[in-house]
Amino acid sequence: MFTIDLSIKNTAFPITVQRKTAEDAEAVYQLILAAIRSGNPDIVELKCEGKTEKKIAVRASEISGVQITQKDGVTTSSGRAPGFFALAGE
């Protein structure tokens, strides 16, 4: 399972969705990068494959960062992979 974390401006916690394959995670990553680069305030809608009931919509102009991590990797005491907020949470 791959986790895609979106860092949102003026928000302390990332928005997270999951994908089952590396290819699907990379496709979401590229979609988010394209939305950030466009500079348009378009809405980006995503669904989570890990929790099928989870859906999010976020304005592309509010996304400040994106990262992909593999879920079965190293985790911190909070159970999350190190990333945007790993130091702040410990």
UniProtKB/Swiss-Prot annotation:
Alphabetized InterPro entries for the sequence: UPF0367
Assigned protein family: Belongs to the UPF0367 family.
Record-given protein name: UPF0367 protein asl4547
Organism: Nostoc sp. (strain PCC 7120 / SAG 25.82 / UTEX 2576)
